[in-house]
């Protein structure tokens, strides 16, 4: 999780606006431990009041090998029931649509013309080049994965001019499966 307060978040959001950023996304997670529908609704309303161009909302997923996973396995996390999570999602749809946002993907909402181009590149199986440690790229039907540590990254760059630790050429079947799988996230589906 992120270690900051709501007031710090608002301060940074306003600073970004002051510096000229005119297309801001805010990521939110619902279904947090001990969270209820009223708290989620209030959080969402406060974000809507800021009027970011894009809002992403995700249901909390407990990943293995994380502190939450250990707490969950020890029975020390009071997570909302599935029905409450569904209510939170429905509330999200209701509030964001009423506020003028349109849903173009399962978790993503934007003002008109402000869809996240970065995400659409993935979901439409278009080429993208990523740089730096741990980065993944997809170009010309080939997937590339860079070294995770800066030491290995620099070593590989010096030795061979790239930092790839994995190169996978997608088959036509791979591309079709990925296009369908990723396209299913979009409200428009696949075409």
What are these regions (language model features)?
Residues 1-191:
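C-terminal scaffold of the Radical SAM
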């Amino acid at each position: 999780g992120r270690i900051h307060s709501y007031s710090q978040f608002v301060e940074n959001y306003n600073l970004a606006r002051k510096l000229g950023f005119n297309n801001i996304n805010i990521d939110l997670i619902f279904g947090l431990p001990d969270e209820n529908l009223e708290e989620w609704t209030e959080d969402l309303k406060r974000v809507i009041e800021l009027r970011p161009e894009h809002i992403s909302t995700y249901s909390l997923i407990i990943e293995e090998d994380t502190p939450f996973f250990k707490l969950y396995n020890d029975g020390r996390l009071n997570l909302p029931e599935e029905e409450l999570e569904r209510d939170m999602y429905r509330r999200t749809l209701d509030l964001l649509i009423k506020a003028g946002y349109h849903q173009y993907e399962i978790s993503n909402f934007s003002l008109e013309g402000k869809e996240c181009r970065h995400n659409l590149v993935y979901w439409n199986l278009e080429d993208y080049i990523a740089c730096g440690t741990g980065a993944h790229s997809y170009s010309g039907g080939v997937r590339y994965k860079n070294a995770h540590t800066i030491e290995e990254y620099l070593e590989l760059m010096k030795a061979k001019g790239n930092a790839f630790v994995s190169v996978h050429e997608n088959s036509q079947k791979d591309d079709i499966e990925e296009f369908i799988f990723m396209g299913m996230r979009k409200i428009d589906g696949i075409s």
